């Protein structure tokens, strides 16, 4: 029986990614639909993705599939056809192409999950297929200029920090589950108003529109393909892109630049910056925004305390190497 999971070390996989020269496309897709045998579904996907050197993260659950992947450009058409024929539910699946194609993933991981996005919803009669109205770039821009329409950002606070639509409401939270609880309470006054919800690729805002409709909101819309889909559609049709800043992404790139505006600030000095890093001291690993000057000053650490611990750790490692 073949091994259907990665057995190569993280260090080696990262080395391979760094030296790879083959052009790749970073893609994302999702679909809410019922999957009866998730294990069989997962294994079939893994075999084909592995065969074509696909890297990335794919979640399979009884409620559907959610994927962010890096595909060799030469295999894109083959894999697109494979997905369309893999399951009738995936026929004409919307596949988002990232705005850039830097090295995004270094391992293939296909996991079975209880849900493809953790929402905390336990209501028995909730129907995730009853969703809001899809809108594309022209209508998005028109509604952004309508003061009676409310835009709600359904991403985490750290995503909102580096980029968002102007005047969009931030539902402050670090989890989607928490946001769904808050948004119903915070927007209770707007049940009869037009509400537009958005996220990176569409998966969270689609479920959020279902949740809003379930809770009695009347006029709920969401961006087809999320921020990524909006930007592609606006550029394709020669329309202004009204999203400001960067779009946070959950892979090695950390973000995609959409506009030239820098709307966030360095955690340490307050200077304009939109570069996320993880604290160099591995026991901390805090995700935070740091400018170039502070990166040098703090050795890519989030604080003086972490910098001291990091230096001490590195010194000990050097001494161990010398002793050998």
Curated annotation (Swiss-Prot):
Protein's UniProt keywords contain Oxidoreductase: yes
Keyword Acetylation: no
Domain of life, source organism: Bacteria
Family: Belongs to the TrhO family.
Role played: Catalyzes oxygen-dependent 5-hydroxyuridine (ho5U) modification at position 34 in tRNAs.
Cross-referenced HAMAP family: TrhO
Protein name: tRNA uridine(34) hydroxylase
Annotated source species: Buchnera aphidicola subsp. Acyrthosiphon pisum (strain APS) (Acyrthosiphon pisum symbiotic bacterium)
Gene this chain is encoded by: trhO
């Amino acid at each position: 029986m073949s091994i259907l999971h990665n057995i190569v070390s993280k260090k080696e996989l990262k080395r391979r990614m760094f030296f790879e020269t083959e052009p790749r496309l970073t893609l994302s897709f999702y679909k809410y639909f019922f999957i009866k045998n998730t294990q069989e579904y997962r294994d079939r996907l893994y075999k084909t993705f592995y065969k074509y050197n696909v890297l990335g993260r794919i979640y399979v659950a009884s409620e559907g599939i959610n994927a962010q992947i890096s595909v060799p450009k030469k295999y894109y058409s083959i894999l697109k056809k494979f997905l369309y024929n893999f399951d009738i539910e995936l026929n004409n699946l919307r596949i988002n192409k990232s705005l850039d194609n830097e090295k995004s993933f270094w391992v293939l991981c296909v996991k079975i999950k209880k849900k493809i996005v953790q929402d905390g919803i336990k209501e028995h009669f909730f129907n995730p297929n009853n969703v809001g109205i899809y809108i594309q770039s022209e209508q998005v821009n028109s509604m952004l200029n309508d003061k009676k329409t409310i835009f709600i950002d359904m991403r985490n606070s750290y995503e909102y920090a580096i980029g968002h639509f102007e005047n969009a409401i931030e539902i402050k939270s670090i989890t989607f589950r928490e946001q769904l609880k808050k948004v119903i309470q915070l927007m209770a006054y707007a049940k009869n108003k037009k509400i537009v919800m958005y996220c990176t690729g569409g998966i969270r805002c689609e479920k959020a529109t279902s949740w809003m409709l379930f809770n009695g909101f009347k006029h709920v819309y969401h961006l087809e393909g999320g921020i990524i889909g909006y930007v592609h559609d606006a550029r394709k049709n020669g329309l202004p892109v009204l999203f400001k800043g960067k779009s946070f992404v959950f892979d090695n790139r950390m973000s995609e630049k959409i506009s030239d505006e820098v709307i966030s600030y360095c955690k340490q000095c307050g200077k304009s910056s939109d570069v996320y890093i993880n604290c160099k001291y591995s026991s901390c690993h805090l995700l935070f925004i740091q400018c170039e000057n502070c990166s040098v000053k703090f050795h890519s650490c989030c604080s003086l305390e972490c910098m001291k611990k990091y230096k001490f750790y590195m010194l000990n490692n050097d001494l161990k190497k010398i002793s050998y």
